[in-house]
Amino acid sequence: MSKSEGQTITKSARAFSPTTQKRREKALLEKRTRIMDAALSLFSKNGVSGTTVEQVSELANVSKSNLLYYFKSKEGLYLSVITHLLDVWLTPLQSFSAEQDPIETLSDYIKVKLEMSRDNPAESKLFCMEVVQGAPLLIKELETPLKTLLDAKSAVIIEWIEAGKLKPVDPIHLIFSIWAITQHYADFSVQIKAVTAKDVSDPAFFESTLSNIQHII
């Protein structure tokens, strides 16, 4: 029987089983991660201006159109990579609280930061490159969330000092010093290896470096 004039046929959306949906979500996440990893590798070597969307898509083994489905532009991809990096870096600092032992807390933080320099040197170099260039794409993140966090954790350090648990020191300069020293082992790894013939990937050198930084700080 033919359908009457004007009758419409509604096509229902395809429904996936929970297992299939979970598998699809995992595949999408893996592809997004692969794109971000490829972008990190290229951005940390060539910068934003020296990297093309085509290069990232080729390294990630996805089509350009597929990449632009996840990230609307090269700048958007870059910002996603570097803000994710900033989130990872700041997570250990967020755990600081006045109830903790300051020496133990700072020693653990130094270790985590040095491990990040050892395990993720490309991330450190990318962040360094961005800041040296004036942080044109990251300045809002530095002026708001980062500043808010540093103000809060500076207050914790001041509480430690006032309780007599830590020698008087400017909290901001203390945090900056930890960042500068630990990230040096990623950003200047070539110089360190040229002078010492080692880097922090060497377990013994890592432990020696960690011990000395903790003592200095």
Segments the model singles out, each with a brief description of its role:
Residues 34, 42-76, 80:
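Helix-turn-helix
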Residues 31, 74, 81, 85, ...:
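Hydrophobic/aromatic residues within well-ordered alpha-helical segments
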Residues 94-123, 163, 171-178:
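Hydrophobic alpha-helical connector segments
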Residues 1-19, 112-115, 119, 147, ...:
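C-terminal peripheral helix-coil segments that are non-catalytic and often amphipathic
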Residues 81-108, 153-159:
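Amphipathic alpha-helical linker/stalk segments
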